[in-house]
Structures are given as C-alpha cells and as structure tokens.
Amino acid sequence: MAGGVPAMCDGITQGRVGMELSLMSRDVIAMSTAIALSHGVYDSAICLGICDKIIPGLFIGALSFGYLPVVFMPAGPMSSGLPNEEKANVRKAFAKGEVSREELIKAESKAYHGEGTCTFYGTANSNQIIMEIMGVHIPGAAFVHPNSDLRHAYNVLAVEQAVKINILSLIHI
C-alpha cells in the first residue's frame, strides 16, 4: 500500500497567506501518517520523505506506532536547473522586449528542476542529514541523486532493512 500526504512548499508561498500554514501542514502530515499506519495490517513501513515538513511529519506520525518497524528513505538532492544568473538574464531580456513570452516560460520551466530536495542547503537537506544521524535512514543515502543507480540500490537496501527489522521483531515476541 502506498499512502500520500498533503504537502505545501513554503518556498512557493513566501510572502503569501499560505506561508502561515507551514507548521500546520507538518501536523496534518503527521496525522495522515498515523491514520495510514493505524490499520494494524502492516509488518513494517517505509517512509519516503523530502522536505522540512514531510520528514518531521512522517517521523511524528511513525512515532505513534513505535512497535512498527519503520525505515525512512530520503529523496536526495534535486539536480540543478537553469542557473539563477541565466534566469535573471532571460527575465531582463523579456522586460526589454528582446525575448518572447515562450522563451521566458521555457526558462522559468527549467528553473524547477525535478524530484528531490531543494538545491540549497536549507532545512529540507538538514532534516535528511538528521534522520541519517539518528539511524532511521540508510547510512549515506541523504545526498544520493534520485535518478541514479546508487539511489535504486539504496531503495532496495531500505526495503531489505525493513524486512530484517520485522523478522527480528518477530523472533523476540
């Protein structure tokens, strides 16, 4: 079973009313995680976290079920998109009428890079490191890119770890 959690990006909501919902969204994620795990039908769980709301929310929700083996898997860092200077140059050129709206939209679309944590070392990345330090991530997984062979290997390792922990918990019952 895969469960989804609502998420907001406070990087996008900066300076808007939605920014005030940042911590509330973390609590909603925690409750959603607890609800998903509350059915008592799981032998273990793997939580896939990415940002500074989702990771703590998943962790808080999982702590409600301390008897359930849970392994956290980080998303890893986003690949770099269009450099800021290039984006700024396209915006300036558009403002001067030197490039078309289509070229502006193309540059803006390249600004958002893809899956993974934000490309700056903010709280999303530090949350992944903290989870690794606490031992709930597979060691070394925090900064492996999402679409790499190594990421796939870490994902397989996370599943194997969840199964091993579950087997150990059954032995001690």
What do the predicted segments below correspond to?
Residues 1-70:
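Long, structured ligand/cofactor-binding scaffold of large enzymes
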Residues 4-8, 50-53, 73-85, 142-143:
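Short, ordered loop/turn segments at secondary-structure junctions
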Residues 6-19, 108-113, 137-146, 161-167:
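Gly-rich Lys/Arg/Thr-decorated short loops/hinges at beta-loop-alpha junctions or inter-strand turns
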Residues 28-36, 57-61, 106, 110, ...:
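Alpha-helical scaffold segments in soluble metabolic enzymes
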Residues 49-64, 117-137:
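Conserved phosphate/anionic-ligand binding catalytic regions in large, soluble enzymes, centered on
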Residues 56-113:
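Glycine/threonine-rich beta-strand-loop-alpha-helix active-site module
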Residues 76, 135-158:
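Terminal amphipathic helices with adjacent charged low-complexity linkers/tails
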Residues 171-173:
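Conserved small/polar residues in nucleotide/adenosyl-binding loops
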